[in-house]
Amino acid sequence: MLNKSYVEKILSKYNIDEEIKKIICIQEQCKDNRYVGVFEIITSKHKLICKVNDCKNNSTNLIEKQSQFAMMLYRNNIVTAKKYKHNNYYCTKLKIENRFYNITLEEYIGKEVENISLDMFKEFGEILGKMHTISANNKFKIGKSFISSDIE
């Protein structure tokens, strides 16, 4: 779905003026006219992740709150991707093929977990505990878990 022209518009919104080297589709799913896409964008200086959700079925406010929560975790030393802002918001809109989509852009922080071990589960539990404490101490509530749960 994302071609070089759309990626240039997205990067421009987030004030990134770099040569686009490669666009890789990590995930695309369209079910019941609802769309979710995740793309890796490699520029001359960065590896970025761009998430695309249709506006019709996914709340911009929900995506913004999830992004705010992720950045709160980031500022509290929980390993999560740093998100980029456009006009003081993490989520922006872009018209693609006569339809509006919610767009977020973040740093690429590495591959997903490939090997599961007991040590990894211990570390995961510790991180969940820290996340809960940060959320409780900041009285931060999103109201919903994951945007992807809407499409599955």
Predicted regions and their residues:
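ATP-binding pocket architecture of kinase catalytic cores
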Residues: 46-141
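Active-site catalytic-loop/activation-segment of kinase and kinase-like phosphoryl-transfer enzymes
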Residues: 145-152
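Conserved NTP-binding catalytic cores of kinases and kinase-like/nucleotidyltransferase enzymes
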Residues: 1-80
